[in-house]
């Protein structure tokens, strides 16, 4: 079965989490050179933080932020921050991105203190609900502003990893997710999007709740792999400069994942990753890629290099590709490959975005920096999307909604 090892490690078939960790002394002074944080925002993001904690990720601080005090209480993290205490009183956002936005703005000074001093920050959240959708773009902006205000020579790299709702979750949630991603793209260097419907295609027998858990596992394993390949001795290391080169200004991104324990396992895993994309795009629409292998102790470097030949062949000679590999004892004979490609186009989710651009025309989806979002603009966007709370009259066409989005530099519905 496809993804047997990943499902097993997620505890879906067998509870084999592989928590053996390398001696912390092996980190040496390297851990002080590059400071990394993973921030989970909202319920989905918090679940990923707990999973990373259980996996024993080394080399990164795990930070949970939420408007829901009860959920936050049960999260396993190194640091926790309750957002918008005076606004939600710890009772959550009620699925309203406007509340999530206000909560993050109200906690701006606390967020700035928490995110200070990091070189690389992963933001993880689910798009389509309240806190993840509304608060995550604010947090991304504060990360960048804090670095500038402190006079740092280089802003931290912000990589956001988000899930996109199942189609069956309804149009309102999907449109909220689109708007959230668009706002997030403004302040993230790269936004990796995992389309939940693709998970169902890849593992069709998964029950819906287990599919959410599987998405958490994919995100957690991806982040863990990148962090530890930077921070720990690996079979083939990826350094921070490699990550920076691929992810800086990368825009929208996809992840593909594959596993194999065949006689040609590394090549087969890469082929599966190139075919099992978590976002509907065509290869060739991106220009940079990061490839990461997680392997058992008996895999040779020759196997990996043969697999990389396939990647170069598929992605093209003009693509900038960085890759690394690390050994995990519990992988056994299995090779897992993850391919992250930046600067991709996905009309289904992202409209007519031009990858790697900093500003966009009126038909694009990202708010130009000169039109920074304000509370009233956020209200207008989400009032237009959600008919239950809209200040606008329900109309037969989308002309009014489209005007709002055009004025802000967003996509048209």
Swiss-Prot record:
Disulfide bond residue pairs: none
Q: Name one GO molecular function term.
A: GTP binding
- One Pfam entry for this protein is Tubulin
SUPFAM superfamilies with a match to the protein in the record: Tubulin C-terminal domain-like, Tubulin nucleotide-binding domain-like
Quaternary structure and interacting proteins, as annotated: Homodimer. Polymerizes to form a dynamic ring structure in a strictly GTP-dependent manner. Interacts directly with several other division proteins.
To which species is this protein native?
Pyrococcus abyssi (strain GE5 / Orsay)
Q: Which domain of life is it from?
A: Archaea
Q: Which UniProt keywords apply?
A: Cell cycle, Cell division, Cytoplasm, GTP-binding, Nucleotide-binding, Septation
Compartment(s) of residence: Cytoplasm
Family of the protein in this entry = Belongs to the FtsZ family.
Instruction: Tell me the protein's name.
Output: Cell division protein FtsZ 2
Q: Which residues bind GTP?
A: 130-132, 169, 173, 216
Cited InterPro entries: Cell_div_FtsZ (IPR000158), Cell_div_FtsZ_CS (IPR020805), FtsZ/CetZ (IPR045061), FtsZ_C (IPR024757), Tub_FtsZ_C (IPR008280), Tubulin/FtsZ_2-layer-sand-dom (IPR018316), Tubulin/FtsZ_GTPase_sf (IPR036525), Tubulin_FtsZ_GTPase (IPR003008)
Q: Matching Gene3D superfamilies, A to Z?
A: Tubulin/FtsZ, GTPase domain
Is ATP-binding one of the keywords? no
Role of this protein: Essential cell division protein that forms a contractile ring structure (Z ring) at the future cell division site. The regulation of the ring assembly controls the timing and the location of cell division. One of the functions of the FtsZ ring is to recruit other cell division proteins to the septum to produce a new cell wall between the dividing cells. Binds GTP and shows GTPase activity.
Kindly state one GO CC term assigned in the UniProt record: cell division site
* SMART domains for this protein: Tubulin, Tubulin_C
Q: Name one GO biological process term.
A: protein polymerization
């Amino acid at each position: 079965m496809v993804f047997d090892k990943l499902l097993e490690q997620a505890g879906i078939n067998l509870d084999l989490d592989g928590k053996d960790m390398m001696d912390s002394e092996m980190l040496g002074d390297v851990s002080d050179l590059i400071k990394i944080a993973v921030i989970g925002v909202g319920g989905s993001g918090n679940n990923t933080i707990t999973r990373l904690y259980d996996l024993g990720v080394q080399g990164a601080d795990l930070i949970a932020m939420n408007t829901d005090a009860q959920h936050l209480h049960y999260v396993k993290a190194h640091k926790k921050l309750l957002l918008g205490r005076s606004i939600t009183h710890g009772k959550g956002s009620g699925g309203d991105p406007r509340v999530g936005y206000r909560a993050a703005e109200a906690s701006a000074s606390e967020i700035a203190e928490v995110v200070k001093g990091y070189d690389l920050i992963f933001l993880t959240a689910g798009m389509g609900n309240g806190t993840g959708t509304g608060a995550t773009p604010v947090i991304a902006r504060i990360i960048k502003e804090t670095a500038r205000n402190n006079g740092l020579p280089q802003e931290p790299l912000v990589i956001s990893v988000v899930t996109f709702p199942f189609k069956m979750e309804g149009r309102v949630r999907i449109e909220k997710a689109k708007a959230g991603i668009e706002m997030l793209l403004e302040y993230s260097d790269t936004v990796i999007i995992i389309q939940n419907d693709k998970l169902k295609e890849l593992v069709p027998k998964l029950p819906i709740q287990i599919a959410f858990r599987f998405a958490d596992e994919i995100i957690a394993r991806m982040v863990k792999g990148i962090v530890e390949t930077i921070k720990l001795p690996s079979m083939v290391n990826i350094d921070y400069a490699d990550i920076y080169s691929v992810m800086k200004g990368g825009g929208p991104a996809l992840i593909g994942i594959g596993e194999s324990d065949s006689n040609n396992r590394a090549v087969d895993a890469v082929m599966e990753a190139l075919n099992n994309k978590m976002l509907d795009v065509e290869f060739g629409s991106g220009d940079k890629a990061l490839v990461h292998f997680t392997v058992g102790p008996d895999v040779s470097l020759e196997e990996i290099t043969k697999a990389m030949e396939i990647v170069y062949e598929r992605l093209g000679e003009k693509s900038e590709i960085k890759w690394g590999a690390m050994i995990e004892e519990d992988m056994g004979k299995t090779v897992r490959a993850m391919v992250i490609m930046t600067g991709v186009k996905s009309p289904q989710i992202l409209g007519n975005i031009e990858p790697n651009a900093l500003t966009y025309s009126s038909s694009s989806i990202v708010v130009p920096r000169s039109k920074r979002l304000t509370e009233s603009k956020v209200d207008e966007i989400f009032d237009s999307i959600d008919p239950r709370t809209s200040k606008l009259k329900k109309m037969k066409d989308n002309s009014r909604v489209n005007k709002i989005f055009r004025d802000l530099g967003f996509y048209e519905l």
